[in-house]
């Protein structure tokens, strides 16, 4: 006889719960696929409008030349990926991109810089970008790497809404992906962000050769944050020639949907974002992800250095599925 897990009622889902164990998250992955997606959809509807999807646009404001050795990343200075190193974009160019993003329906504008962490001299221009983008009526997000003492407070004073800092993968798999910093380094920056009163955007990458248990470990690590991230981007690895993961593992489409569903069930009030790798997904697979509780996408033709579905394709998909942008 198959045992299914009962979806929490809204009241139960809001109540504090014990920490998720990896075994408990693995039990979600082990459910029959339709049972898992059904449970995730119930949890999703208890906390969000079922047919609303938040759109974010991501811009690389400083490309390439990063000192870190993240095995998936085209922007590491350690790998020959053919990517040209660029300086920090000027403010007027950033604002041009932000205005275009808003005109196309994005509500959040994310700015990413390929640094281990920002130097003190980098902060002033970034803070100005945050202030000016906010004046356009957009939510602001930055991903700048690891922060030093006081930098999160500077960002908060500038009005930053979200700080993105992904933990990438499960603790036990982390050292196989990056060696120039630790998972604890990432968690320390997230603590600084929370203490400064900035919303946290934190997720990971799947399809890097990890096991399903490692994917369960990633979800458990995210869900057990106090509080869980406000936004949880789930990336499907885009293999970049020249990186150590150029010939890395892939993930079955149904397993990717299972990862989305597990994120929704364990983090019921977080936005779960379909991030990198959407270009390779069929419309049908994306629809399954929305059924499983994804309610945010990166919108626009480019994600830092990788391709993303064209805006027109997303508009058509939203119309076919009856989805509304927020």
UniProtKB/Swiss-Prot annotation:
Radical SAM core domain: residues covered: 51-278
EC number, as in UniProt: 2.8.1.6
Note describing how the cofactor binds: Binds 1 [4Fe-4S] cluster. The cluster is coordinated with 3 cysteines and an exchangeable S-adenosyl-L-methionine. Binds 1 [2Fe-2S] cluster. The cluster is coordinated with 3 cysteines and 1 arginine.
Alphabetized UniProt keyword annotations: 2Fe-2S, 4Fe-4S, Biotin biosynthesis, Iron, Iron-sulfur, Metal-binding, S-adenosyl-L-methionine, Transferase
Record SUPFAM superfamilies: Radical SAM enzymes
Requisite cofactors: [4Fe-4S] cluster; [2Fe-2S] cluster
Positions of disulphide bridges: none
GO BP field: biotin biosynthetic process
Biochemical pathway: Cofactor biosynthesis; biotin biosynthesis; biotin from 7,8-diaminononanoate: step 2/2
Major enzyme class: transferase
Annotated [2Fe-2S] cluster binding sites: 110, 141, 201, 273
Catalytic activity: (4R,5S)-dethiobiotin + (sulfur carrier)-SH + 2 reduced [2Fe-2S]-[ferredoxin] + 2 S-adenosyl-L-methionine = (sulfur carrier)-H + biotin + 2 5'-deoxyadenosine + 2 L-methionine + 2 oxidized [2Fe-2S]-[ferredoxin]
Assigned protein family: Belongs to the radical SAM superfamily. Biotin synthase family.
Record-given protein name: Biotin synthase
Classification lineage: Bacteria, Pseudomonadati, Pseudomonadota, Betaproteobacteria, Rhodocyclales
